[in-house]
Amino acid sequence: MENDVKENLEEEEDRLLPPPPPSQSLPSTDSESEAAFETNEKILIVDFESPDDPTTGDTPPPFSWRKLWLFTGPGFLMSIAFLDPGNLEGDLQAGAIAGYSLLWLLMWATAMGLLIQMLSARVGVATGRHLAELCRDEYPTWARYVLWSMAELALIGADIQEVIGSAIAIQILSRGFLPLWAGVVITASDCFLFLFLENYGVRKLEAVFAVLIATMGLSFAWMFGETKPSGKELMIGILLPRLSSKTIRQAVGVVGCVIMPHNVFLHSALVQSRKIDPKRKSRVQEALNYYLIESSVALFISFMINLFVTTVFAKGFYGTEKANNIGLVNAGQYLQEKFGGGLLPILYIWGIGLLAAGQSSTITGTYAGQFIMGGFLNLRLKKWMRAVITRSCAIVPTMIVAIVFNTSEASLDVLNEWLNVLQSVQIPFALLPLLTLVSKEEIMGDFKIGPILQRIAWTVAALVMIINGYLLLDFFVSEVDGFLFGVTVCVWTTAYIAFIVYLISHSNFFPSPWSSSSIELPKRVSVSNS
């Protein structure tokens, strides 16, 4: 009798205890998929409201500055993609060739980027899963692997630009002593060093990014103050939309650099670093409100930094012979020749800002790579192992590029054009799954976006894809030469368009018999007001 009672008590204990973590050696299933952040890694959101007045139902708790501080972090990590070396090159070329005339477009492109990133955050907060994980369940196996491949290609392309940007900055700051390939090695090593900080908590890593963003802000603000661009022209450029046939390519570059495919995946994972109860509707809405404030502030800062760079080069090189030749490699030298030394030579100020941009973006790129690979493939690997794999995928081609193009500025510019094309090609494969998922009630529950926001989001997505399509068409018309190359491009273009049509047809926005009904996700339970 005593044994029976003992066994019953043990069984009851087992039911009350949380399940043990799945073994690393066992094959993973959907129910065992690895979370973006473990429970002990998440930041606890403390309630500062009075315990006598608990918030229930649909109404979020009142605004709290202390709680906003707890939510601050993911938006600033997300904003790094708006400040990477590729964006800085787009800024300097826009300023040198178009002057102040595209500042209005930079502002509205940043606003469009904020909308897309908030949809990504919405998916992460409302479902408790990030975009790559949801894509794994939403699409059939063949489509999932295509999406994963495209995301990895986009990430590698962005990483090459970011690492090369850091390497150029290191070359500038070492006065040419360190070659480009040495800068690549240093950047790769630094990245692992910074990622090590994650073991000491998410807040430590976020603090490092805050320092890097502050470094960029101070460096480029110093350049802005030293060069004294025209305040009148700056305000006209922001408030008066202007676009000429001579600046269309730069305009396309400004918009195209704002939406980074890997950043859409990244933000949906970063917001899960805060411990939020997804079953309480008021808490989910509260988190979305704070993330909107935080992301808006972060992207306003990124807009100001991009504005500083654009106006500095507009002041120095607009209307000059050097305008069409300026790029990331020679920008520092041109600045030095134009504006000279001062207390701290502008060449080194530019180098410090560029280094901060390159270092921060390579770290977020590695971070995004872990979520993309882990989410799509559901790999049961330790974080450092995933970091090694994803970092190697980018560092190896970057090292080859650095060795081959070490002394050729023209070749690096051509390579950068091809990398921009690669990024543009991948944009639909992040935007379309995001818009599909955020519009589905069975996934989002009460946080599915409404018809008006759906139309706005699809309009923005269509605009971004059309603009990038123009960039692709313009590039291939000027670069594609030879019958075999032309046929290859046509074949790949046909397959590319067919897959985009499939993704669009899979969404709820455009009902189609192509939409898969065989893949069913567990319906998200809506939270009642009681």
UniProtKB/Swiss-Prot annotation:
It is found in: Membrane. GO terms for molecular function: manganese ion transmembrane transporter activity. This is Metal transporter Nramp2. The keyword Acyltransferase does not apply. Seems to be involved in iron uptake. Signal peptide: none annotated. It is a multi-pass membrane protein. The keyword Phosphoprotein does not apply. One of its GO terms (cellular component) is membrane. GO terms for biological process: cellular response to manganese ion; iron ion transport; manganese ion transmembrane transport; manganese ion transport; positive regulation of unidimensional cell growth; root hair elongation; root morphogenesis. Disulfide bonds: none annotated. The lineage of its organism: Eukaryota, Viridiplantae, Streptophyta, Embryophyta, Tracheophyta. Its main location: membrane. Belongs to the NRAMP (TC 2.A.55) family. It comes from the Eukaryota. Residues 1-35 are annotated as: Disordered. Keywords: Ion transport, Iron, Iron transport, Membrane, Transmembrane, Transmembrane helix, Transport. The chain crosses the membrane at residues 68-88, 96-116, 153-173, 177-197, 205-225, 251-271, 297-317, 339-359, 395-415, 418-438, 456-476, 484-504.
